[in-house]
């Protein structure tokens, strides 16, 4: 396996973009200890679910908003 890796090490082209993105790849395979950002991610998923439910209620007209028309037809009559 080491011989194969040494062959691949010399191949490829060094680019400015690759050099700039190299620090992002240095964390590959590492796992944050504990729960990490799971709680924050769960909060955002919950907020997104509430947003989707509100949109569905507006679309189904089960959430009535005063003075907000939901007419999908063009008002110009084209």
Curated annotation (Swiss-Prot):
InterPro entries: PSII_PsbH (IPR001056), PSII_PsbH_sf (IPR036863)
Residues passing through the membrane, by range: 39-59
GO BP field: photosynthesis; protein stabilization
GO MF annotations, alphabetized: phosphate ion binding
One term under GO cellular component: photosystem II
Entry's localization field: Plastid, Chloroplast thylakoid membrane
Entry keyword Disulfide bond: no
Keywords, in A-Z order: Chloroplast, Membrane, Photosynthesis, Photosystem II, Plastid, Thylakoid, Transmembrane, Transmembrane helix
Membrane topology: Single-pass membrane protein
Lyase recorded as keyword: no
Function of the molecule: One of the components of the core complex of photosystem II (PSII), required for its stability and/or assembly. PSII is a light-driven water:plastoquinone oxidoreductase that uses light energy to abstract electrons from H(2)O, generating O(2) and a proton gradient subsequently used for ATP formation. It consists of a core antenna complex that captures photons, and an electron transfer chain that converts photonic excitation into a charge separation.
Quaternary structure and interacting proteins, as annotated: PSII is composed of 1 copy each of membrane proteins PsbA, PsbB, PsbC, PsbD, PsbE, PsbF, PsbH, PsbI, PsbJ, PsbK, PsbL, PsbM, PsbT, PsbX, PsbY, PsbZ, Psb30/Ycf12, at least 3 peripheral proteins of the oxygen-evolving complex and a large number of cofactors. It forms dimeric complexes.
UniProt similarity note: Belongs to the PsbH family.
Name of the protein: Photosystem II reaction center protein H
Organism field: Ostreococcus tauri
Gene field: psbH
């Amino acid at each position: 396996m080491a011989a194969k890796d040494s062959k691949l090490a010399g191949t490829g082209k060094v680019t400015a973009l690759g050099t700039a993105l190299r620090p992002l790849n240095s964390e590959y395979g590492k796992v944050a200890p504990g729960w990490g950002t799971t709680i924050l991610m769960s909060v955002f998923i919950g907020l997104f679910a509430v947003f989707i439910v509100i949109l569905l209620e507006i679309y189904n007209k089960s959430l009535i908003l005063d003075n907000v028309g939901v007419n999908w037809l063009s008002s110009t009559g084209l």
